[in-house]
């Protein structure tokens, strides 16, 4: 009798395992079909820092880094916003000139890399560009600027960067600048939000049709931006403070205000912004050793900074327990339940710390879609999350800029 029961149990378990495998195969097949049909967009990667190396080519499948065109194709990712990241430094004329030159050089590196891989990718400057390039089968390269520091105190720089292809500026980074306060400046607030010059920057971005990015900025600066901007704004790589306490994330009130503005939060798949990190003394010791080795990352050359950043993230990824795809989709769920499906997207922060269990680079992006399908999201909802919402915001910025230009007779 026991033998018969054991046999029945084995048969039932085999059917259960087979059913699960069949279900996962169906999900994978459906995800492939969806990704071929819709426009998929990641609004933030820091890969341009790697382009400063002469040997880094977006057109080949690299062993290091998280983003290149072959892996974008593998992961079903059509479009990437390549962020020109400039760390905060001194605020004086000499530094502003140096930062301007670095920004232009990085922009040129993006152009050069896309041009030499023109059979695989093309730069996009408008929503229509993105959908046209999608139809051609090529990858799409948008440009953003992370940190308003390269603007310095010169408002004309905003248009100059727009003319060079940048379609958003993250107003600050880890420290305060002349535009606004950062959410993570150790010295606290300097402007109590957005400075008077920052208000001019936001208005100029509105005039041009350039998206204002509120990731990294302080809560007070966020509310000031919302009050100042006449166009929908974005949080290019932030998550939900209700699920993970971090000044880099948006709380529920901010999300409600973002909805009223018509904007979108692009959920950041950087582990510490999705799930509170567990205390790990070994990890902290290793990271402190790297901070000490590299003078707390201050006064470094570009090569030294890149080496320090690489060592830092290698150690962090080795010794910490990463958040999962499920954790990331929990944040998407939270936004959808609180303010609706029209205000959420994905901003990986790849090559800047982004990467979670199951999605360590762009080749694994479909795993997010798999989890969305498991939770019952429809094709149309997935289309909005993966690109429809951010393209709506960009188009609205384009439209309002055009209307402003026509009213001004220019």
Regions found by a protein language model. Name each.
Residues 190-197, 213-221, 225, 250:
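Short, contiguous, pocket-lining structural segments
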Residues 20-192, 241, 245-410:
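N-terminal hydrophobic targeting/anchoring segments and the immediately downstream early-domain regions
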Residues 200-214, 218-221, 254-263:
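Substrate-binding cleft of carbohydrate-active enzyme catalytic domains
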Residues 154-158, 221-230:
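Distinct, well-ordered alpha-helical segments
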Residues 191-206, 225-235:
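Alpha-helix-loop-beta-strand connector modules within alpha/beta enzyme cores
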Residues 1-4:
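Positively charged n-region of N-terminal signal peptides that target proteins for export
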Residues 37-39, 208-210, 231-232, 344:
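The start of beta-strands in P-loop NTPase/AAA+ ATPase cores
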Residues 8-16:
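Bacterial N-terminal signal peptides
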């Amino acid at each position: 009798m026991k033998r018969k029961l054991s046999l029945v149990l084995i048969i039932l378990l085999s059917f259960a395992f087979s059913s699960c495998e069949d279900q996962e195969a169906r999900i994978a097949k459906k995800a492939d079909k969806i990704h071929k049909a819709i426009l998929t967009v990641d609004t933030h990667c820091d890969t341009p820092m790697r382009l400063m190396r002469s040997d880094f080519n977006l057109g080949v499948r690299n062993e290091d880094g998280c983003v290149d065109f072959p892996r974008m194709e593998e992961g079903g990712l059509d479009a990437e916003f390549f962020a020109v990241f400039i760390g905060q430094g001194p605020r004086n004329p000499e530094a502003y000139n140096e930062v301007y030159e670095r920004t232009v050089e990085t922009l040129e590196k993006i152009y050069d890399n896309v041009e030499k891989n023109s059979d695989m990718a093309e730069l996009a400057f408008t929503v229509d560009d993105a959908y046209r390039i999608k139809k051609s089968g090529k990858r799409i390269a948008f440009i953003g600027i992370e940190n308003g520091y390269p603007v310095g105190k010169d408002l004309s720089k905003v248009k100059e960067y727009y003319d060079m292809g940048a379609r958003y500026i993250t107003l600050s980074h880890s420290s305060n600048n002349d535009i606004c306060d950062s959410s993570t400046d150790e010295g606290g607030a300097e402007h109590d939000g957005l400075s008077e010059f920052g208000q001019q920057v936001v208005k100029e971005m509105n005039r041009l049709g350039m998206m204002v990015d509120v990731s990294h900025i302080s809560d007070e600066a966020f509310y000031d931006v919302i009050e100042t901007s006449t166009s929908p704004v974005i949080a290019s790589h932030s998550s939900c403070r209700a699920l993970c306490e971090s000044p880099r994330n948006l709380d529920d009130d901010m999300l409600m205000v973002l909805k009223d503005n018509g904007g979108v939060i692009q959920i950041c798949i950087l582990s510490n912004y999705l799930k509170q990190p567990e205390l790990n003394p070994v990890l902290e010791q290793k990271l402190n050793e790297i901070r000490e080795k590299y003078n707390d990352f201050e006064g470094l050359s570009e090569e030294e900074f890149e080496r320090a950043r690489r060592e830092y993230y290698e150690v962090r990824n080795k010794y910490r327990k990463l958040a999962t795809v499920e954790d990331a989709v929990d944040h998407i769920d939270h936004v959808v339940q609180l303010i609706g499906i029209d205000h959420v997207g994905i901003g990986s922060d790849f090559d800047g710390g982004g990467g979670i269990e199951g999605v360590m680079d762009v080749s694994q992006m479909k795993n997010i879609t798999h989890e969305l399908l498991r939770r019952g999201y429809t094709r149309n909802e997935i289309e909005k999350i993966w690109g429809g919402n951010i393209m709506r915001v960009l188009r609205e910025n384009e439209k309002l800029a055009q209307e402003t230009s026509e009213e001004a007779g220019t």
